[in-house]
Amino acid sequence: MRNKNIIMLLMSSLILSGCGPQPENKESQQQQPSTPTEQQVLAAQQAAIKEAEQSAAAAKALAQQEVQQYSDKQALQGRLQEAPTFARAAKAKATHIANPGTARYQQFDDNPVKQVAQNPLATFSLDVDTGSYANVRRFLNQGLLPPPDAVRVEEIVNYFPSDWDIKDKQSIPASKPIPFAMRYELAPAPWNEQRTLLKVDILAKDRKSEELPASNLVFLIDTSGSMISDERLPLIQSSLKLLVKELREQDNIAIVTYAGDSRIALPSISGSHKAEINAAIDSLDAEGSTNGGAGLELAYQQATKGFIKGGINRILLATDGDFNVGIDDPKSIESMVKKQRESGVTLSTFGVGNSNYNEAMMVRIADVGNGNYSYIDTLSEAQKVLNSEMRQMLITVAKDVKAQIEFNPAWVTEYRQIGYEKRQLRVEHFNNDNVDAGDIGAGKHITLLFELTLNGQKASIDKLRYAPDNKLAKSDKTKELAWLKIRWKYPQGKESQLVEFPLGPTINAPSEDMRFRAAVAAYGQKLRGSEYLNNTSWQQIKQWAQQAKGEDPQGYRAEFIRLIELADGVTDISQ
């Protein structure tokens, strides 16, 4: 009888597994023609939930029967206690089976080629997250190509740490003391012999761990039913414990959770009470719907209550982004986050999961909240984000940072910025201190890439008939390929500061770092289906990366080469 019941349970589980999520397709807020109707989705969900409840009831009944039949009741009692968890897991799985392509990404087009004669200025917010790299990795590890809108090339290029020292002699001297350094180089673009690649590196000054100000952190954790699977809440719990290890006595931590309602799982407590903090993290359980708005409100209340003047005051939101009840209007949430940002409480977001993953929301509120967006797909990624790069995440050395590059038509005919599509600013926004822009954390390394068409190289766009003659004039400006301006505010400042750098036209053999990041840029562009790569193959990209791998103490570059191989294999299968 016992074996028969167990077999029945296994069959039920297999049926449920067959109903699981299918490979995600590009949604970008738009439904594909094959997407089920709302009625079909609801009917499928209800049927799956009903079957899940029946299976859960059978599991509970079997456990009760065994407790009554066998003498070792204490050991068997655990199976009875697991039955409700089984039921919640089945319901969560059923919720997502009917519409696998529900992840939401903000749609955008690649930056176009621009003529310097008409558009000499590139203006953008100087900020970068790295969440896209980990999310793309998750797709490839599942044997899937990512939706193009999930691929943000600048986040992929900037995923890799740099060994560049801010005191390096390659740094371009600044006209006044600034919280960052700059360097650049020019080299032929590997994917097009008629193009030149400009790489600009910006490195923020770092701070030693003992120099960190006191922190007032609030963990805001989604504990709704959609978070029950291993790659969601359990992964977040393990990840947060990595951050707990780094806490000091002067750091205060509170934990707020939200599902159908929100609650304080742990009132603010000193970071020295690690056992108590970890116990509160372990006690979290996933169940119910997702009232993200109410959770944010309660988290901000806790952050305000424990506010440390001159310290770090930040909310760390961990969720799959599935805000489905409460204040779920994006504009309302953005308004709340913006208001709190002005009071000194910032917000970082950590995404997990795949189906129903609302990345567009996660990225947006992190930007508005002057924080960072990260995607956690493995515990190793959590180690990188919450441990190795903790200072970059928590300590701001410059805020509202904007960059503007003016290209000299005497040297440059056309340019195309690689990445940063979602961080473009209007030209007049550069000098407007009321326009919000990105923040740079301590020790953060940012790479900018531009594909240039120099005079003498074959242009994509015909020269304007009435354009002025751009022959080299006899002036100092002929020594300048471009002019870089960076505007920023100090963390507590109200007025922006300005620093300017000349960029010369000398082309040298590319450095190892430039060759590797060019390979990474090609990888990202190819995943997006870029028209600018001239049929560059995955094997070519792999070769470029292997030849420029260099020292790789964390193994990130070796892993990247493996991802190129996966992308090549997935592409072959899909063709």
From Swiss-Prot:
Q: Say which domain of life the source belongs to.
A: Bacteria
Entry-linked Pfam families: VWA, vWF_A, YfbK_C
PROSITE patterns recorded: PROKAR_LIPOPROTEIN, VWFA
InterPro entries for this protein: Ca_channel_alpha-2/delta, Uncharacterised_YfbK_N, VWF_A, vWFA_dom_sf, YfbK_C
Q: Which residues does the UniProt record annotate as the domain VWFA?
A: 216-394
Compositionally biased tracts (Low complexity): 28-42
The record's region (Disordered) falls at: 19-42
Residue spans crossing the bilayer: none
- Protein family (similarity comment): To Synechocystis PCC 6803 sll0103.
Could you identify this protein by its name?
Uncharacterized protein YfbK
Which gene name does the record give?
A: yfbK
